[in-house]
Amino acid sequence: ADIDDKNLQKARAELESLGVPVLSVSLDVADELQWQSVAQQAVVRFGKIHMVVNNAGVGADSGPIESQEKEGWQWALDVNLMGVVYGAKVMVPLIKDHGEGGWIVNVASMAGMGGVPYSGAYNATKAAVVALSEAWAEELKAAGIHVAVLCPAFVQTRIYDSERNRREQYKSKALNPDEESSFSKKAREMVQNGIEP
């Protein structure tokens, strides 16, 4: 699922080329009703839900605090935080329904572990994702649902590209999203092997 149709079609084609069964649907993660629709379509297509990966994110508020607007903060809260909340709220009951356990994988950021200047809303919302993930890991343990949170550093995404032009120091630090990094490899292995994070 993605709000960007071009990215959605690219991901669908890549997965289908690997022989993976695919359901591709447009999703604005900040809309709980859209999450419910996606969940219903996924259950119809696959029979049950085992995992949800919350990977949406927006930068929104780049700049000094005195120039930041409420709208930028609200956008970051809606996408980066509430998108994760809605994803779990809608999918967890469906994972619990089959009684086999499952996974919630939330993608936060190293920015959520410590402040990156001029990115207050991004830092704050990603820190909230880390805290939620830790809370949910305890809350859902008895149901056999594992919760992992990934905190990548700079990855070459649209957020990175918009910041790169403004912040020279980022240029040599970004991960290439087409190459498997150590954190994504570890996450993939945990899920494949059923190892707790």
Label the predicted regions.
Residues G63-I65, E69-Q74:
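Substrate-binding pocket helix/loop in short-chain dehydrogenase/reductase
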Residues I65-E66, G114-A121:
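Active-site loop immediately N-terminal to the catalytic Tyr-X3-Lys motif
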